Regions:
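Contiguous beta-strand/loop segments that form the cofactor/metal-binding neighborhood of enzyme cores
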Residues: 1-93, 113, 122-139, 162-165, ...
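Active-site loop of classical SDR/Rossmann-like NAD(P)-dependent oxidoreductases
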Residues: 114-125, 149-156
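C-terminal hydrophobic helical "lid"/dimerization subdomain
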Residues: 154-166
Length: 181
C-alpha cells in the first residue's frame, strides 16, 4: 500500500522477532516480528514504515484476525481497520472523515429496490469492468499497470519480505534492497 500511495521505493529493511510461544509446540517460527522499512520518494525524501505482525492473539479475541494499517504524515492520517471494516482519514484541509465504514451495506430505494454498495462490492465490480474493457478493446494492460495492483508491483513487497527474512537470519542487521528497473 505504501508503494502504491507514494510511488516510493524501499531502500533497506531491518526485522526483529520473538520465539517464545509457538516454539513450545516444536514449531520453529516467530510469534511476533517487528520490521522497519526505509523508503525513498521520487524527490529523494526518505521516510520509515513500521510493520508489527504476530501469530499470537488471545483465544477470546472478537475476530479470527485483527489487521490495521496507519499512515501518519505531516498534514494528515489514514487509518484502516479490517476488523471494524472502516477507514478514517484526518487531514488539516478537510478534518475527520469516516469513509465507507463497512465492507458492504444495503441501500434501499423508494421503489423497494435494494442495491449493495461498499468497497467490498466496488473492488469486485472494478475488476470485472476492467476485464470487460480489456475484452472490448477499451483499455489495455499498460492502462491498468499504473493505477491497479499488478504482478510487477507485487515484486516490491516480495523483496521487502525477503529482506526482512534475511535480516532475521542475520541477527536483525539492516538489509539493502536493490530495485530492478
Amino acid at each position: 500500500v505504501i508503494r502504491f500511495v507514494t510511488s516510493a521505493s524501499p531502500k533497506r529493511v531491518m526485522a526483529i522477532g520473538q520465539k517464545t510461544e509457538i516454539i513450545q509446540y516444536e514449531i520453529n517460527t516467530y510469534d511476533s516480528i517487528q520490521c522497519i522499512i526505509e523508503w525513498e520518494m521520487l524527490n529523494g525524501t526518505k521516510f520509515t514504515e513500521t510493520i508489527l505482525t504476530s501469530w499470537i492473539d488471545p483465544e477470546s479475541s472478537s475476530a479470527i484476525s485483527d489487521q490495521k494499517i496507519k499512515f501518519i504524515g505531516t498534514s494528515g492520517r489514514y487509518e484502516a481497520d479490517q476488523k471494524e471494516r472502516g477507514i478514517r482519514i484526518n487531514t488539516d484541509n478537510v478534518g475527520v472523515l469516516h469513509i465507507n465504514p463497512d465492507f458492504c451495506m444495503p441501500y434501499g430505494y423508494n421503489d423497494g429496490d435494494i442495491q449493495w454498495r461498499g468497497y467490498g462490492i466496488d473492488s469486485i465490480t472494478t475488476f470485472l469492468n476492467d476485464v470487460a474493457d480489456l475484452e472490448d478493446g477499451l483499455k489495455n494492460i499498460s492502462d491498468l499497470q499504473e493505477n491497479r495492483p499488478s504482478f510487477k508491483e507485487s515484486l516490491i513487497s516480495t523483496m521487502v519480505t525477503d529482506a526482512a527474512h534475511k535480516s532475521l537470519k542475520n541477527g536483525s542487521q539492516w538489509e539493502e534492497i536493490k530495485i530492478l528497473k
